Amino acid sequence: MLSRSCTLFLGTLLCSSVSFGQTESTAPLNLTLATPVDSVRFQNHRYNEFYRANRDFSYISPNGELGAPSKYVINGELIASYFLLASPKSRLSIAVTQRFMARTRTDRSSPIRTPSFRLGTQVFYRLSSNVTRYRYVEAQFFHHSNGQDGDTFRPNGTYNTETGDFSTNYIQATYNWGTHFSQRHGAYYNLGYRWHAPIFNSSEGLTGHYGFGRVLGQATYRLLARTQPEPVSTVTTERMRVTLQASYAVNQLDGWSLTAAQRRLNVELSVWYIPAFSRDAGIFATAGYYGEDPYNIYFNDRYAFVRLGIAAGFTRYTDELRK
C-alpha cells in the first residue's frame, strides 16, 4: 500500500509539473527573430520571461522536511500558472495560479490528511525599458485552504490537525528588480508585504496566533548558458540557481514580542541545479527554519529543516518572438 501510494503521488506530481507548470504547447509555433532589444515588443517579451523565471519551482522531496515534528514518506508542491495576458504588445501581464502542497505521512496507509490548496491571480507590470537591469511590480490575491470543514479545535482546546478547518485569503504586493546577462548570469531581488486582510473570511482561532501580516524578501543568483553553440541557438537556459527567501510576521501574536524571531521568522536557502541533458527539471537542496510552518493548520510548528529532491520549472529565454 505504501509503495503504491508513493509511486502514484510521485508520478502525478512530476507529470503535472512538466505539463502544466510551464503551460507550453507542443504544437509548432509561428516564430520570428526578435526585433532589437530597444523595441517595446522585445521588452514586453523578455519581461514575460522574467515573470515566469522568478516564480517558485514545483518539487518533490523524498522524506520531506528532515527535522520536522512529523515524519513523512514524500512531500511536494505543484505550481501551475496560466497566463491569460502575456503579449509582446502589453507591459501588463495577468496569470491565474494554483499551488498544491501535499505531505505524505508515515502513518498507517500513508495519509496526506490536510493538503494545502492556494488558488489566485497574479498581476505584473513592467516599470523599465531595460532588459538587462529590469524592474517590475507584482500584485497577488490568493485563497488558502486545507480542504477540511471540521471543528478547528479538539475538545481539549488544541488545534485539530486531522480534520480541522483552515482557510484564509491574502493580498500581496512586491517590488521586483534584477539583472539578466544572456549566456552568463543573472540576479533577482524582491521586497514586499503579505496581508491576510480582515475584510475577507478566515477560520476561527487564527487571530493572535497566525502571521496575518508578513514582510517578505528574496535574493537569487543564477548561472545561464546557451543550449547550443552560437549562432545555432537563440535559447538560453538556467544551469544553477541559489535562492535566499525570508519573511517576518509583524502583526500581534499572543505571548510573543515583535522581536521574537524564533516565532516570527521563516527563512530558506536553496541551491538548484539543472543537468545539461535535462530540459526543465533538476535537483535541489534546501536548508531553512520555520517559525510558522506554512502548511495550513500546522502553523504552530516551529523547526529547522533540510529538504532534498527534484524540481521542475526552470525557464528558457529566447530571442525569438511569437508572431
Describe the role of every protein-language-model region:
Residues 25, 253-255, 260-323:
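Predominantly the C-terminal beta-signal and adjacent terminal strand-loop region
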Residues 1-40, 318-323:
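Cleavable N-terminal export/targeting peptides
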Residues 76-82, 122-126, 268-270:
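Short alpha-helical segments and helix-capping/turn motifs at coil-helix boundaries
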Residues 34-54, 87-263, 291-292, 301-304:
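Outer-membrane pore/translocation modules
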Residues 23-84, 311-315:
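Short glycine/proline- and aromatic-enriched beta-strand/turn motifs that initiate or cap beta-hairpins
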